Amino acid sequence: MKKQEDFKGGYAMLQLVLGRSGSGKTQWIYERLSALVDTEEDRPLLCVVPEQFSFETERSLLEALGPHRAARIQVLSFTRMAETVFRSTGGFAGRRLDDSSRMLLMSRALEMTAGQLSLYTRHTADPEYISSMLSMLSELKQCAVTPLALEKTAKALPKGTLAMKAQELSLIYGAYEALLGHTYLDPLDDLTRLAEVLPESGLLKGALLFVDAFKGFTAQEMQVLSALLNMADTVTVTLCTDTLDDTAQGLGRFSPVIRTGLRLEQLAQRQHIPVAKPVVLSENRRSRSEALLRLEEESFLPDGSPLETPADDVTLTACADIYAECTFTARTIRRLLREEDARCRDFAVVTRNLDEYRGILDAALEMEGIPYFLDTREDILTEPLVSITLCALRCAAGWDTELLLRLMKTGLAGFSAHSISQLENYVLMWRIHGIGWTRDWEGNPDGLDAPFTEETAKKLDSLNRLRRRLIRPLEHLRYTLYPRSTAASPEDAADRLTGRDFAAAVYRYLTETRAARMVRLQVARLDRDGEHALADRYARLWDMLIDRLDAFAAAMGGDRLPADRLTELFRLSLQAADLGSIPQSLDAVQIGAADRMRFSAPRTVFILGANEGIFPAYPAQGGLLSDRERQQLIELGLPLAEPSEQQTVEERFFAYMALSAPSERLYVSYRCSNAAGETLTPSLLAETVSRLLPNCRRLTVPTEEENSLGGIESHTDAFGRMAELWHAETAVAASLKAFFSAQPEMRSRIDALERAADDKPIAFRDPQTARQLFGREMRISSSQIEQYHKCRFAYFCQYGLHIKAARPAELDSLAFGTLAHYVMSSLLPQYVKAGLDGLTQAKVRTDTRRTVEQYVEERMGGLDNKPARFRHLLEQLLRTSSSLLWYVVQE
């Protein structure tokens, strides 16, 4: 078989290609692959890259080699390599876990081991605690640490907290693995299994393997590389460093990468595999900008020398706050798109913490009409479909009025806004709660003291039909989840059911409420309105929920648990679900976090948040193990992630990669204050730019003067600037007013702006509207005049819109007065007509009781469904009314 030769003419199994950022390592691989496509027709050619870089690599190879030649090369991530091998070896036999199912199993593992734990005994439904455990589990698996290895390490430690932690972690880890059994496959184990089956599969035997764009490898990935070294004819690995000699003794910007290179060489040497002399690429092929080259060469070096010439390609910006920073970024991108031959995909925005910028940066880009792709994880618990499901489960455990109203307002229960308002007004008026939702309502919909007419009876009948339509599917769900519960106390029931029964009950509820149809209608409406991204999200939410129910039924199996516990676990699984984002445009600004982002040859890069402790970030605090404990375990042979000192070094590497990413232009911004108004200082990253490039462009934002057009990059910007300059007597203000006044569609907005800016009194512009609200003739009482002068808006609401404050149907002072007046007006004329001689106080009491009970029956729906407080207050009213009537009779 023909062997590959390195560039020195000798044969090698491991070839390292070294070079700093921009030195052309990836291009070197593409050129090498291009040559091998023509000369090595019999051997597999593989290019292994990080998962998030695979699409870009495939596209680049397609553009460089053409479709026919590019088809000879397999572009794989480690995950895709595992999938490829498992398809041939049968490694997919089992149900694969996702984050939601993993959360369920960890919660159950904690529950199973609770009696053996002392340190890790928190609540098994606490999402943050479970996430911490899963994070620790992920680290252990990626570091190829088994439960047995943890247990052995715990026994080797002296008695103390760390020994207890290691022992308890091994118990939890072991319980988790036991739950996996032979039924489930944890993707976190894929690379471990891949390393085991690779030698037997023979699929990659004799391959020419190129590994590119990794900054380091986990222990699992090193195990896979170890197996590949024994199978492939050559393994070529690129590393972002120009040397393997770590003169900085572990503290340099390339120290983490150098450690990776040395580990690879040691791995090959232990297996007696030859290692070629590294290929070192020294020329920067990315940029010709002197300023950008200086940053790449000298950043984070103690003896870096400043560039004394102008450095206009680099801009250092001091921003007032995060909002000014994002606005500046969006407007600058818009300006560059307008002024230069640039496309959105030529721009990249880098932050250290994407969550900090979510809702601000994307809003600023949308304001400027700039397409972007921001792959973020969003909380789906507030989505209507998820909300109606969780509300239904909680309502089944007890008829909570607030939850029932929330369920109706999701828009998926089939109730119109008018119906929801009617129900809400009624339940608030009559204080309906608990079991009151399951009984026919009898209270007057118009209030406690309103007459009960035929029209009122129709309203009440309509409300009861709405109530039954809401409650009936929930009662079916309740009877499945709590079959032995009484109507009053479901939480006391000892009912247990399987995860399959639980999932089936939830699906039946969604079917009865026709939630799927409502989702389809919403998707169609959003599509018609042009909201295609939101429509796609709603459609995927339904698929996600059904997948979650299937996964829940499978993960819980036949184990019988209380319904409340199953509800907790199902909520956990939904909380861990990731709907993901789908790019809506091929030409979009790329936004990413510095530790995960893979740059696709951006011409311009914006680095945001170059503040102390933000970027570079301080080492993460917390976690289940302290730095000291982590170091002790590493010294005992457990290959855990490095402690915080090494994290600090890695942060500098992330900053270096961001600084060296652009080919033409770099913007670095830092904030002067946070949301609380506290002062923020520039970080080492910003200080490095300032020190190495003393003549770079420096800006402070906001910078616009009132008479300036600066910063106006869109129609929205221009309207906002006009509002700011409304009272300014400048040429810019006049020009903007003239520009928008000439647009008929802007007339209403300008009028509204003028009224607000000039503080003009609110008045009817259309007399017909005033007549419709107040009539042709207005009759004004003294109380109305008093209300008008007290609050004009309150007067308008009360007498124009005829809005009444919602008032509970209870015997308050107003109802008391109405009822007392009714008693007096009903009985006193009778007594006067019949004569007062012989009238006794006992008869007055009897007549008063009869009159009040008649009033309550006719106008308040009777006493049968009234609470004890109502009856008590009614007795007080009877005594008071009777005494008052007797006093008047005596007078």
Task: Please give the residue ranges for each predicted region.
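Conserved P-loop NTPase-based nucleic-acid remodeling module centered on helicase motor cores
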Residues: D42-K152, G160, F796, L819
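Conserved Walker B
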Residues: A213-K215, L354
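Anion-coordinating catalytic cores for phosphoryl-, nucleotidyl-, and glycosidic chemistry
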Residues: L14-R72, S77, G94, L225-S226, ...
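Extended, H/D-rich, highly charged conserved domains that either
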Residues: G216-E283
